[in-house]
Design a protein with these regions (language model features):
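Short glycine/threonine-rich loop-to-helix capping motif typified by GTGT followed
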Residues: 15, 126-127, 206-213, 241-244
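Active-site cavity-forming subdomains of large catalytic enzyme subunits
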Residues: 1-169, 192-199, 245-264
Length: 265
């Protein structure tokens, strides 16, 4: 569950994973995360206050981000000051941030995730707002009442592509190209427990390709994990995977056509 940090219930939300207190108000087995706008971090940096609202009083905030969010949020704060909005609470941004970090250290939850960067960098911004991520926070896709975001994931076994002290680029290209085609095929043959998931997956066709065995690859290369060389190798290896993945995706688009919501992305 993700909750924006302007929500009036955010302080209780932070306590959901605590090991003390009324167990009826705890969710020990649920993963939780904070969805934080840049404006909160700006207020925190300046030592300013932060206002919590009931979502029924500020319906637009959920679906906007960036400058538009900042403008609307400050408008709602002015309405709260003049009494037009009755249900709100003003807190010190640093106090809320301190509680966020305290709960994170104590329970591992809620995670800290950032709303504005996820939306600003989303290639699918033309079809809606990203409201959350997944369990491991590695995908950021649009969700709404008709669509439940689904992303088919795979990994390249990096140490299997180390040959004679370097990355075997041609072998890596072959593996990535095969993996991209495989993941795209999964979209069509997958089992979907609910129609909203199938609708989303086939409409946007999102896939994710990463790597595994990074430390093993470093070992084969004789590179220390805690070194500048390791950082450079991480950049180089992922740059290659990204390039070949995009190249393979373009080839698939030529062969099968673009996905339904490609235009405008």
């Amino acid at each position: 569950a993700y909750l924006e940090c302007w929500h009036l219930d955010v302080e209780e939300f932070l306590d959901l994973g605590k090991n003390t207190g009324d167990d009826r108000r705890r969710t020990h087995d649920m993963n939780t995360a904070n969805w934080i706008p840049d404006l909160f971090m700006k207020r925190l940096e300046k030592g300013e206050k932060w206002t919590l609202f009931s979502p029924s009083d500020v319906p637009e905030l959920h679906d906007i981000y960036g400058k538009e969010f900042e403008t609307k949020y400050t408008e709602y704060e002015k309405k709260a000051e003049t009494g037009e909005i009755k249900h709100f609470k003003t807190v010190e941004a640093k106090d809320l941030w301190r509680k966020i970090l305290s709960m994170l250290f104590e329970t591992g939850h809620p995670w800290v995730t950032f709303k504005d960067p996820c939306n600003i960098r989303s290639p699918q911004g033309h079809v809606g707002t990203v409201h959350s991520s997944n369990l491991c926070t590695e995908i950021t896709l649009n969700t709404n009442e008709d669509e439940i975001a689904v992303c088919n994931l795979g990994s390249i076994n990096l140490p299997q592509h180390i040959d004679e002290g370097k990355i075997n680029v041609e072998q890596l290209k072959s593996s990535v190209t095969t993996a991209i085609r495989m993941l795209d095929n999964v979209i069509d043959i997958n089992y979907y427990p609910v129609p909203q998931a199938e609708n989303s997956n086939k409409k946007h066709r999102p896939i994710g390709l990463g790597l595994m065995g990074f430390q093993d690859a470093l070992y084969k290369l004789g590179i220390s994990y805690d070194s500048e060389e390791a950082v450079e190798f991480a950049d180089k290896s992922m740059e290659l995977i990204s390039y070949f993945a995009i190249e393979a995706s373009c080839a698939l688009a030529e062969e099968r056509g673009t996905y339904e919501t490609y235009k405008g992305s």
